[in-house]
Curated annotation (Swiss-Prot):
Cysteine disulfide partners in this protein: none
Keyword line: Phosphoprotein
Region (Disordered) location: 26-104, 193-406
InterPro entries: Paramyxo_PNT (IPR035430), Soyouz_module (IPR025909)
Species: Hendra virus (isolate Horse/Autralia/Hendra/1994)
Biased composition (Basic and acidic residues): 296-317
Keyword Flavoprotein: no
Protein name as it appears in the record: Protein W
Stretches that traverse the bilayer: none
Modified residues (Phosphoserine): 257, 350
Amino acid sequence: MDKLDLVNDGLDIIDFIQKNQKEIQKTYGRSSIQQPSTKDRTRAWEDFLQSTSGEHEQAEGGMPKNDGGTEGRNVEDLSSVTSSDGTIGQRVSNTRAWAEDPDDIQLDPMVTDVVYHDHGGECTGHGPSSSPERGWSYHMSGTHDGNVRAVPDTKVLPNAPKTTVPEEVREIDLIGLEDKFASAGLNPAAVPFVPKNQSTPTEEPPVIPEYYYGSGRRGDLSKSPPRGNVNLDSIKIYTSDDEDENQLEYEDEFAKSSSEVVIDTTPEDNDSINQEEVVGDPSDQGLEHPFPLGKFPEKEETPDVRRKDSLMQDSCKRGGVPKRLPMLSEEFECSGSDDPIIQELEREGSHPGGSLRLREPPQSSGNSRNQPDRQLKTGDAASPGGVQRPGTPMPKSRIMPIKKGAQTRSLNMLGRKTCLGRRVVQPGMFADYPPTKKARVLLRRMSN
């Protein structure tokens, strides 16, 4: 084939491409090796079998019919360049006479990059992933050196960007790849995973009461509470289950005393409380108690003071320590603090710190009578006090349930009765009513 035939073939190919630009798939400048059609391959295989069929036939005497000659072969049908016009054999290849047979033209050729281990297409230089920063090129390149890559990238594509990372850099300096990962579309602010030793549990810091109850200064009401939504999720639950050596003073008061809570009652709730349990000293109704919570001086008992709890009185007469149901981890007290809800209630004259009472356990049966139970008085002189035993149902108006994931609530929605006494939320129970004594005992046993 001379040069003139090659030029004519090139012109024919150019004319065909210009006429069929929409049907031909673009190869981005790379050569596509097209396979012959199925019809051409079938015909060539049949011709080969026919040409070689008489070659191995043997006669009865065991001698072959042909002594290895090629008379049975059809040399003209073989795929060899025999003519001078560029055709291959008698069949027309897909490189010549394009429009003769539609099977000869492969409109969607399969293009394969001649690159070893093309990770994310960083070595192609073409297409949407032409940039070497795309994909995982910095992370993946260079990790399969050795037995996998027979030919290095520098020999296959000498113009390819060198993105391999040395082994010592890969093992030691991983922080230096942050900028490269950021350009690859990853999260540059991601926190790296640091495996922790699970065999040695981390010791939690001791609980500070100010985190739960504020600073505890009940008299400091100069600061106005913030007018806005109060996120109830920020209120942490006071726990008293774990008894370590570094327990706090606030928790020790509950551990050594009867954790009973006295709530103020309004006249609408007086019907639900036994009148025998009503405590009242009319001379002290309007006084503010000058002593801290749970700490009282020694004082002789006046004859007109009534016992607020018959069980407490009987146990003290017998000389024993009164039975007490320990507080659950789901209970917490609304004592006086800098909490905006508590301060709002203190302004209204019904702050829960004045309605909460702790009893000191009697030292012996002798001085148990000389040390009566006392109650912190509130500014509301008209409201009598009532005993709220542990585990007894409370009025529904007294409870503000704290649900996990609860929405924020405005201060304007909170009434006078909200947050009085204790707020109880038990797991697995509805928050619209407090648990019974049986449920408290069962939950306490399960927690232990």
